[in-house]
Amino acid sequence: MNTPAVPAITDRRHLANGRVIPTESYSDQPYIVRTDDGAWLCCVTTGPGHEGVQGQHVTTLRSTDQGRTWSDPVPLEPGDQRENSYAVMLKVPSAPRLAGHVPRVDEEPGTPPAGRVYVFYNHNTDDVREIISHDGKQSIRRVDSLGHFVFKYSDDHGRSWSAARYDVPFRLFQCDRANVYGGRLCFFWNVGKPFILNGSAYVSLHKVGQMGRGFFQQSEGVLLKSDNLLTEPDPRRIRWETLPDGDIGLRTPPGGGPISEEHSYCVLSDGTVCCVYRSIDGHPVESCSRDGGHTWSEPRYRCFADGRRMKHPRAANFAWKCANGHYLYWFHNHGGKVMREAPGNADGGGYDDRNPVWLSAGIEIDTPGGREIAWSEPEIVLYESDPCVRISYPDLVEEGGRYYLTETQKDLARVHEVAADLLEGMWATLAAQLSRGKGPVANDDRRLLSLPLHGAAMPVTVPLPPLPWFRVRDHSVLDLRGKDTGEGVALELELTLPDGAPGRVLLDNRDGAGRGFCLRTAGAGALELMLNDGQTASHWISDPALDVGRPHHVVVNIDGGPRVISFVVDGRFLDGGETRQFGWGRFSPYLRHMNGAADLHIAPEVKDLRIFGRILRTFEAAMRAAAGSGRRASA
């Protein structure tokens, strides 16, 4: 019997090219710490069926070859059918005393073994089988986000775990006391990784005040701080404090919605703690603490370096500090007002559209209030061919100058190596924009066309080399099915529009049958790209970003991997602003190419033109825009 072949997808960003982390069925939160014996220790929530079913549990695995192979899973709670879920780990640094640690007079001599690993997780200790919604009208049988917050530890680099589990006590907040059980039963979970600051350990917790609409109906974030976890060998003597001060956790900005959850923390070079978390407001929320988590700045929506609000649905959005002192931020680059006001957003619609995954690069900057992080324009880092597949709950691992991301789409967990030149280009470009240094050199790799030629005028018509195909026949299988190539095309042009009229054709290679592409004005400062291979047509309209009479640098990317059309104007990625949920759009997975007539027609409004047989990364577009502005200024 022949087994159907699966076409190879060469694009490293595609999920299928990751290394699988073994799980039972459901897979969540594949988080990694590097142990002192050099292994990767991964904790993952798994189970026999869908998310939240009885028997859901945490396992750990070890890899000594960057996720190519894994040890047999070790369950934290062997044989326990009570839900134990949503684990995060913290490794005790090898140094016996951390900088900033001052021993208390009642602290006994001795330290935990070097490299001890703690794992924190939810445990349904009381075996609660059913709860009621906040309005009392609904019976809820999913019970994996309540009970006790507990930990175990390993002194053998994650090969085994302590037999005993230990409760982490936390203070009741206003939302706990106001829940349907008056705080006698608390709802919570955690996805945020622990961190260390001034000799103390901090563990995130997401409190849930109301269960019901959208499952979690009201939520906020707190920190559980231990001033002796890193130095106390006896887990029974570990002390805990709930932060922030008072009884209200990290919430949305004034006027925001009731959802503030999945908090992710970074410690800046001056000791500032920066937190980012999800909402149903269409934007990620951030807040900073400059006193070790006791008080926090008024929450605000996260912005790019130029002040534009970032957009994000109700999904995990995590930030990490890298070994070079810079940062990376995982988000999904859509949302805004349109999403916030969409029917069904609070009922669960906000959970959708976690594909593709975008990264923003961060660099610390000085502000009057202290250090903050400036964030770059976005880049696609991972995707799956089916837009409905959701990608989330990542972790970042660095080793030997290489970068790896873990992720899950709830069925499979994987590890992916990320192109280092992508990250370095993002950081370098942002640094140049912040006047910190010279940006990366322009890469003309796979440039197919560059006009006008030196000393010549822009031609009206020019022969156009063949453009890459997005989908071809797979000759390795008998049925010659189609396969995606992952190829892309970038149109880079400098132009000045004389008016705001729609329908002005700027670039056109269409033949008499309509095959090819056309870039034209769509009115009000927007551009429209039309693609046609003779049987399949796609189009996308940009945000209205072009001003009449002003020169603009435009990059249009036709990315055949995730099948995304995007526009970058004057170095800014167009994300839809407040008028659209998505600034980028998808073209048909069945569109094979955008080739048409032999010649390309160019409008006089186009002053410079380059066409590439690949996409231009956003940071490349930004640097090219800056170079074009410099040329115009010199002229």
Predicted regions mapped to residue ranges:
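Short, aromatic/His-centered strand-loop micro-motif at the edge of beta-sheets
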Residues: 529-553
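Low-complexity, glycine/proline/serine-rich flexible segments
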Residues: 436-487
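Repeated scaffold domains used in trafficking and secretory/extracellular systems
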Residues: 84-88, 313-317, 392
